[in-house]
């Protein structure tokens, strides 16, 4: 399992998925690995996901809505988020 943390628009063409991990993570480039607190957050709040419940499994308390507005989306899929790849 490859740990990764994505911030900003590494693959901005993707919508904000709220689906299962396999479908989302397989669309995630494995080179998208940046440290917490990276300046590449683009205002999407890449700090403290783990403290907000954005651990593996996601959470429905993500009021950022994937940084594009809305609600009840998992933070990854749009380029920001924290999780573990199945690769």
Swiss-Prot record:
Tissue expression per record: Expressed in the upper portion of the hair cortex.
Superkingdom of origin: Eukaryota
KW Flavoprotein (keyword) present: no
Keywords annotated in UniProt: Keratin, Repeat
One Pfam short name: KRTAP7
Record GO cellular component, one term: intermediate filament
Region entry 11 X 2 AA repeats of G-[YCGS], spans: 43-84
The protein's assembly and partners: Interacts with hair keratins.
Record function comment: In the hair cortex, hair keratin intermediate filaments are embedded in an interfilamentous matrix, consisting of hair keratin-associated proteins (KRTAP), which are essential for the formation of a rigid and resistant hair shaft through their extensive disulfide bond cross-linking with abundant cysteine residues of hair keratins. The matrix proteins include the high-sulfur and high-glycine-tyrosine keratins.
Stated family: Belongs to the KRTAP type 7 family.
Name under which the protein is recorded: Keratin-associated protein 7-1
